[in-house]
């Protein structure tokens, strides 16, 4: 049986942790002038992937 391939886009976006996967939050790439400093600071924090999305990500990262 051939090796399972890792989805490289998913590999770059998600990191495996003991409790699931962590990810970066969206809305911090452009159009930042109208967003408050507090909002941008909170968006810098990493967050957990929703439990319903974990199986799909785990399938795409077979060796994580």
Swiss-Prot record:
Origin superkingdom: Bacteria
InterPro entries (alphabetical): Ribosomal_bL35, Ribosomal_bL35-like, Ribosomal_bL35_CS, Ribosomal_bL35_sf
Keywords for this protein: Ribonucleoprotein, Ribosomal protein
GO MF terms held by the record: structural constituent of ribosome
Pfam families reported for this sequence: Ribosomal_L35p
GO biological process, one term: translation
One Gene Ontology CC term in the entry: cytosolic large ribosomal subunit
Alphabetized Gene3D superfamilies for the sequence: 4.10.410.60
PANTHER family in the record: 54S RIBOSOMAL PROTEIN BL35M, LARGE RIBOSOMAL SUBUNIT PROTEIN BL35M
Family affiliation: Belongs to the bacterial ribosomal protein bL35 family.
Name of protein: Large ribosomal subunit protein bL35
Native source organism of the sequence: Shewanella pealeana (strain ATCC 700345 / ANG-SQ1)
Origin organism lineage: Bacteria, Pseudomonadati, Pseudomonadota, Gammaproteobacteria, Alteromonadales
Annotated gene: rpmI
């Amino acid at each position: 049986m051939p090796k399972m391939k890792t989805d490289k886009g998913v590999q770059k976006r998600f990191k495996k942790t003991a409790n699931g996967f962590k990810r970066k939050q969206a809305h911090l790439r452009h159009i930042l002038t109208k967003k408050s400093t507090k909002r941008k600071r909170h968006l810098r924090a990493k967050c957990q992937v929703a439990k319903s999305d974990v199986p799909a990500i785990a399938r795409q990262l077979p060796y994580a």
